[in-house]
């Protein structure tokens, strides 16, 4: 079984207290947080049908956590291709286009001589010192592009955000632009993150290649190493246009990627890089590994695991692995393995084909840099403008877009695969699931004469969380854990009445989107639905606002929800609210109406 986030440690009293007594807390079970360097164990599906369902969810999960569910509008690329340099057997040009309005993707286009149609390859570079210009014995991005072009492929190498011609945006926190860091908790609320932007850039890079008349649109591959390997397998998982994939030195069960651009908040709550890569099956996948990095066990561990996924399709010959005796790399031996793989699957070469690399000499940097001798075009957005444009576009989609996708995005933000169905109530009288610190509320509940289970929320260790790199990629936030705890409580008690106040009241409304709640009394503590600051303070869950937050949850909830203490900044269409604070007398009246004594 997969090593995963321990099951929600919601701990409840095992029996109902007598009337007039205070429901007893239980001691919450402590647990170990997940990290990017845990050893993950792959859980394999029992059947192809089961895997198709899981793979579809994972594909959607990548998009949702990346802020791409619903998918952003594919606005015009406005591509500019210029500065072509012609060599004997290939050409290279400078390229920029807009993946979002005013947000540029920059890179180089390498083409074979001739008119095509040619197969094509998108080639993200990874965390080499010189990005797409890296040209060393360890890795050469222009070297692989030149050789692939000579072999008859159109190749687009493009910058990761913050590298080379994209340098006006920072790649990691601490590298500032306009005196602020790019990305952060507010951006996370809206699904705007570095990894998601780079995934979108990769998707739009495929759009760019498809727009070229010389490209065979049904024969597009992807390859990159290190962080470029992460970009490769994420793109390959979500974009059906990728016909062959070769992530290099990245697929591992004991290191999931060390950069912010590989760690989308919420992505790996219950998955790992092997399973994410397996979503590509049964399309042809080459796993290139090295003896000197975290892929050193590929031939004994990750490759056999991947073969089992391909076996479900009867397509074991569509996955292959090689291990190079070297440290972390995309060196000549690794590149030659990729050349052969792409030749086989994109050009119809025999399975035993060998393709040797030819000597190459990249053009001087000024001839490859997009903005070496021309100014940045007018209209390029700053990080602040990018954030505000992203939020405005998200609001438009929430107002008139695909509501099914929005609802799915909420489930992904909360870390659940699907809405649960209602179970049968176990007794003639409902059970109360109680989450309050208000003694008056507890006394009112006790007077109702109903069985009570008081939620003991999983403790959140903020100090331990802060010490874990990319914590939110692998673990729920404190608010997210509260929601999960309530979902578990309600799932175990069909027909229960939920009573919750304060932050638990907010979590209760979100839980009602996941598990059927027939009746709930929620005090939301005058929460301001219009304020990002309020979400950051009381309900920080990455992707929550991108998915319509509590408004989407209320639309998904099917029971009778009574919302109190809403104030004047808590308006949800179709949901009645009460401005006043919830009182014990009101609770008692409702409980008697709903089945109390």
Show which residues each predicted segment covers:
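Catalytic-domain carbohydrate-binding cleft regions of carbohydrate-active enzymes
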Residues: 223-262, 266, 270-313, 318, ...
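Alpha-helix capping and helix-loop boundary segments enriched in small/acidic/polar residues
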Residues: 133-140, 174-178, 189-200, 222-233, ...
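Generic beta-strand/beta-sheet core signal
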Residues: 110, 125, 158, 223-225, ...
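Cap/lid segment of the alpha/beta-hydrolase catalytic domain
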Residues: 113-211, 250-261, 434-492, 527-538
